[in-house]
Structures are given as C-alpha cells and as structure tokens.
Amino acid sequence: MRAFLEEFKKFISRGNALDLAVGVVIGGAFGKIVTSFVADLFTPVLGLMIGGVSFQNLVWKIGGSPEDPVTINYGSFLQAVFDFVIIAFAIFLLVKAINTLQRKEEESPPTLPPPEVVLLTEIRDILNRHSQ
C-alpha cells in the first residue's frame, strides 16, 4: 500500500498531471461562464432581434397527447451549439496566441555576448598563445 501511495505521489507531482488538473478545473469554470453567457445574455438578445422568440421554448411537437406531448427541443440544442462555437473560438484564439509566442521565441536571433566577455576571451586567448 505504501508503494502504491508513493507511486501516486510521484505521478500527481509531475508537471503534466498538475497541468491537466488545472486545465480541467479552469475549463469547467469557463464552460459554465459561456453557458450562462449564451443562455442569459446572447440568446435572449438574439431572440428579441428575430421577433421576440425564446430559444428555450422552441420545440417541435412530434406526437403524444396534448397534455403530455413528445417534443424535440431544438431551441436547447441551438443554445448548446452556440456554447460550442464560442468555446471553440476562445480555444482557437488561445492556441493561436500561444503559437505566435512560441514562434517569436524560436525566431529570436542568438544573443551575442557582451563586449566585455568578447574582450576577456580575446585576452585569454592571447595569453594562452604567449605562454606556449
């Protein structure tokens, strides 16, 4: 049991596992924010613009009794599609920004040593040649 706990401790303390855990927590919170944005802000305004429609009430009745109809709730589906598109766009922007930063780091020219270091290196080389 102790070996199992030690192995788990090593696993959880590695960077990848911690990064994944942080990503999952932040992703879950971000998903809730986007869902609220779509349900509470975006779709009501969009519904108002297209004629006072509430997306939550958009249903297609396909059968059943009038008291208990069988419905396809395509308004809720549209809200989920809006959620997905907004989250996918946000992730795209994040990945694009990270890739741009990585490219800038890769493209940066090698830095030259300061003039003092160059001078000291030359002096060292001269002294080495004279001592031989």
UniProtKB/Swiss-Prot annotation:
InterPro entries: MS_channel, MSC/AndL, MscL_channel. Keywords: Cell inner membrane, Cell membrane, Ion channel, Ion transport, Membrane, Transmembrane, Transmembrane helix, Transport. It is found in: Cell inner membrane. The chain crosses the membrane at residues 11-31, 75-95. GO terms for molecular function: mechanosensitive monoatomic ion channel activity. Its main location: membrane. It holds the Pfam family MscL. Homopentamer. Belongs to the MscL family. HAMAP family: MscL. Channel that opens in response to stretch forces in the membrane lipid bilayer. May participate in the regulation of osmotic pressure changes within the cell. PANTHER family: LARGE-CONDUCTANCE MECHANOSENSITIVE CHANNEL, MECHANOSENSITIVE CHANNEL MSCL. This is Large-conductance mechanosensitive channel. It comes from Synechococcus sp. (strain JA-3-3Ab). The gene is mscL.
